[in-house]
C-alpha cells in the first residue's frame, strides 16, 4: 500500500521535539510498518496551499533531524505545488458549485493521513479536519470558493464559529474529495495549548472526529460565556512572522493581521474599540521572498 502524510506547513503547530507532527508521524509510521507497509511507499507532503512552498530548512525544522534524514535523501518529502498541473487532479464541482482540484499524490495513495491541529482560527473556527485538506492541498479555484468576500462578509463569519458558511464549505469540499477518491482521510488532530503542547489527540474520520476536538478546544479558545467588553487592545507586530519574515512591517499584511485579531476577539470587544499596535516600520518588506 502507498501512504501519503499530509502535514501542515511552518505556520502552525510548534517545532519542539515533542510537537504533534513529530510524535504523530512516528506513531503512525510504527503502525503502518507493523501492518506491512514498506518505507519506500511512504511520502511526506507539506500542505502549504497557496502559502510559499516549504523550504528545506523549514522541512527539517518541522520534522526534526531523524524523520528528515529518514525520508529526504530518498526524495520522499515534498511540498504541495498548486501550479504543478502534472500533480493535480480535477475532481469537478461539489453540489454547491465549488471547483475542487486536488493534489495527485493524495488522490493516488491507498491511504491519506491528515496530521492536523485543532487551533483557533479566524477562518472557520478551527484549523485541522476538513479545513486542512480544503485549503492545504488544493488549487486557487478551490480556495476561491471560501477565502473570498462573498463568504467572509457574511453575518455568520463574525464572531468566529464552526457553523459558518466558510466551515460548511471546508466540510463539503473535504467530503467531496473522499467521495471522488473512493477513500476517507484518516485524520490525526491535536488540540493544542498556547505553547503548542498537546492537550488532546483525536484520530479517525474527520466528519466524526472534528466535533469531538472542538468540544475540548472550546474550553480554552472561544469563551462563549464572556460578558465583559474591552475598549482597548494593545499588542506588538513582530518582524518575524509565521507566513514569512517581513509581514510585521508591511502595511498591507499588517492590516490583514489586524483584521484577523478583530475576528478572533470580536466576542469580547466593544463596538468602537481601539487597537494600539507597535511595529518597527523600518521599511523592510522582505522583497526577496514576497
Indicate residue ranges for each PLM-predicted region.
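Short glycine-rich or small-residue beta-strand-to-loop segments that form or flank ligand, phosphate
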Residues: 2-16, 43-50, 234
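Short internal beta-strands
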Residues: 36-49, 274-280
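Acidic, Ser/Thr-rich peripheral helices and adjacent loops at domain boundaries
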Residues: 60-74, 286-290
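Conserved, well-structured core segments that form the ligand-binding/active-site neighborhood
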Residues: 68-229, 236-239, 257-262, 267
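C-terminal catalytic subdomain
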Residues: 246-290
Amino acid at each position: 500500500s502507498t501512504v501519503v502524510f499530509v502535514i501542515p506547513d511552518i505556520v502552525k503547530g510548534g517545532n519542539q521535539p515533542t510537537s504533534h507532527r513529530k510524535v504523530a508521524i512516528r506513531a503512525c509510521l510504527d503502525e503502518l510498518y507493523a501492518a506491512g507497509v514498506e518505507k519506500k511507499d511512504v511520502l511526506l507532503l507539506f500542505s502549504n496551499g497557496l502559502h510559499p512552498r516549504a523550504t528545506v530548512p523549514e522541512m527539517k525544522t518541522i520534522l526534526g533531524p531523524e524523520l528528515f534524514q529518514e525520508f529526504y535523501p530518498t526524495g520522499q518529502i515534498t511540498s504541495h505545488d498548486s501550479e504543478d498541473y502534472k500533480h493535480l487532479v480535477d475532481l469537478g464541482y461539489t453540489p454547491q458549485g465549488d471547483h475542487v482540484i486536488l493534489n495527485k499524490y493524495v488522490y493516488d495513495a491507498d491511504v491519506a493521513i491528515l496530521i492536523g491541529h485543532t487551533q483557533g482560527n479566524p477562518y472557520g473556527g478551527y484549523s485541522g479536519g476538513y479545513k486542512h485538506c480544503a485549503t492545504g492541498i488544493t488549487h486557487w479555484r478551490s480556495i476561491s470558493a471560501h477565502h473570498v468576500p462573498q463568504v467572509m462578509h457574511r453575518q455568520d463569519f463574525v464572531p468566529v464559529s464552526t457553523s459558518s458558511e466558510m466551515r460548511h464549505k471546508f466540510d463539503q469540499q473535504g467530503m467531496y474529495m473522499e467521495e471522488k477518491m473512493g477513500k476517507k482521510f484518516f485524520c490525526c488532530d491535536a488540540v493544542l495549548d498556547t505553547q503548542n503542547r498537546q492537550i488532546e489527540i483525536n484520530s479517525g474520520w474527520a466528519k466524526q472526529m472534528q466535533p469531538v476536538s472542538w468540544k475540548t478546544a472550546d474550553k480554552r479558545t472561544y469563551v462563549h460565556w464572556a460578558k465583559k467588553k474591552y475598549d482597548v487592545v494593545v499588542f506588538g507586530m513582530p518582524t518575524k512572522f509565521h507566513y514569512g519574515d517581513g509581514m510585521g512591517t508591511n502595511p498591507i499584511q499588517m492590516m490583514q493581521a489586524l483584521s484577523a485579531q478583530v475576528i478572533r476577539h470580536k466576542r469580547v470587544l466593544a463596538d468602537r474599540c481601539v487597537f494600539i499596535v507597535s511595529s518597527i516600520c523600518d521599511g523592510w518588506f522582505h522583497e526577496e521572498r514576497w
